[in-house]
Amino acid sequence: MIKTARQLKDLIRNLSREKSADAQILMRNYMMERFLERISLSDYRDKFILKGGMLVAAMVGLDARSTMDLDATIKGANVNVEDIETLISAIVTVPIDDGVEFQLKSISEIMDEAEYPGIRVSMATIFDGVVTPLKIDISTGDAITPREVRYSFKLMLEDRSIDIWAYNLETVLAEKLETIITRATTNTRMRDFYDIYILEQLHGTTLNPEILHDALQATAHKRGSEQKLLQAEEVFDEVEDSPVMQKLWEAYRKKFSYASDLEWNVTMGAIRSIYQKMIQ
């Protein structure tokens, strides 16, 4: 067990060099893991379902994807400010001998660019005097097809895993595909494109095209975008040929070393490939 800030910083520094990853992001990831472990031991462990960037990073490795935030969906519980405050307060007080203290800073409704309503939780963790900010986005009612799965989440600095509920691969991809198709050239989130590419590269052989098809339809139905799916091929052409999207991709490549050698047409090729497998 990590007991001091010096010990933690040394481990983070070494991992940062090994993975060519930002040390600040790794510190946040460590603290998010501390929160996840508390979820896994809490009375809410069967209500929290991990999704988003932290799940993708766990699936592909920190050297291939980084994230600054934790995203989850909740089932069987109300998602409003009051109930989420009660839920979070219970989770952060789960006793674990890791020396990490959580302080709740704010809870508010998500209003920015959300495909679905939700709650944003801002916290700070304190460990041996080191303060790290955390942000958690929580939604409910997501279309998970066919259902959430038990996921063995490998810890970053320890040789063990924690069991949590998470999106299945097909639902992860379906949400990103739906966003790419419906937002077209207004989508500034290059991570959606990268995530589909890297997941196809590393997990394409385990992907079930029929489940992906059903997951995409269910996601579109939930978001009211079924008609837009009919223009998917045209959207892919428009997005790939767009100078604006190409410029955004170049900026993403410069910002994240794991994408630095990845050409835009190759990324779009992976997206087309997954889509073609799904509709055959």
Model-derived regions: residue spans:
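Structured mid-to-C-terminal alpha-helical surface segments
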Residues: M1-F48, A57-S66, L70-Q280
